[in-house]
Amino acid sequence: MVLGCACALWRVPAVQLPLWFGYLGAGGALVWVDFKTTWLPKRLHWIATAQVTAGLAVVAVHSPGVLVTALAGACATSGVFWLVWRFSGSFGFGDVRLGLLVGAAAGSMGLQAWTTALLAGTLIGAGWAIVHALRGRASEPFPYGPSLWLG
């Protein structure tokens, strides 16, 4: 996980580092809890959201365009996830809240990165779901948050 975070930070423009520190720091703790318990605690989510928001505020001073794309990514991701949660029940609401953070971080890198991140997270989640089912646990919930976060 640490190596993955270091690799992610290596690719991020320096002006966006405050946003990504919040995403990888508190967001990483959030998905670790999800991985272990299939539960995304609200309090930890709000801490991660506050850190990402503070990072976005710093980024906006230097690059206002990044703020627009990050907010668009956050709204689009959490909006789509809300629709899936509301009408299919296949997501927990914690995944909807996590979509806000993932969308902001991925959106800050542009439309192509946002699309790639969501596709990668979905593919990682699908792979994890297959492994989960092959282990005979298909009827049990599995944590989608970590795969989404890794995307």
Model-derived regions: residue spans:
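Short charge-dense sequence patches
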Residues: V2-L3, V52, V102, P143
